[in-house]
Amino acid sequence: MKVCNLSSGSDGNATYIEGTHAKILVDAGLSCKELERRLALLNVAPEEIDAILITHEHTDHIKGLDVFVNRYRPLVFVHKDGLNALRKKLKKPLVISTFDDEPFLIEDLKILPIPVPHDVDRCTGYVISENEKKDKYFHRFGVHY
């Protein structure tokens, strides 16, 4: 599994994660243009992104979401308890998939959602692992453990 922090902090949060069969982003807190530029530095075309996992609805986590999704059509996932807050922040309507607290798969990546305290209705951290490999990555809005 390959993990690359594209940006972390109040100016924007986005992390690229690549498994054998899946390429995802955790958050899209940069402009679409900046997401494209930073993905290009990794030799990743934006249309290769399969999905975007959203931690929560603050602008520094979703700034480029509308434009990126309308342009490249990745799936978008957010915890069911954060859906309404996310929809209120978006400029354009998007198709958004929800999940609960159970693990789910995006291709070969196993996603384990974990509630994280923050000043929002629902903030979700993710433990991401590739199949049954031992490599795991925990993402909590810009802080990696």
Residue ranges and their predicted role:
Residues 12, 34, 60-63, 120-123, ...:
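Residues that form or flank phosphate/diphosphate-binding pockets in enzymes
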Residues 4-6, 11-14, 56-61, 87, ...:
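Structured catalytic core of nucleotide-sugar glycosyltransferases
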Residues 1-42, 124-140:
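Conserved beta-strand hairpin/beta-sheet module of binuclear metal-dependent hydrolase folds
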Residues 78-133:
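Metallo-beta-lactamase
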Residues 7-8, 28-30, 57, 81, ...:
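Active-site metal-binding loops of divalent metal-dependent hydrolases
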Residues 32-78:
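Active-site metal-binding motif and surrounding structural segment of the metallo-beta-lactamase
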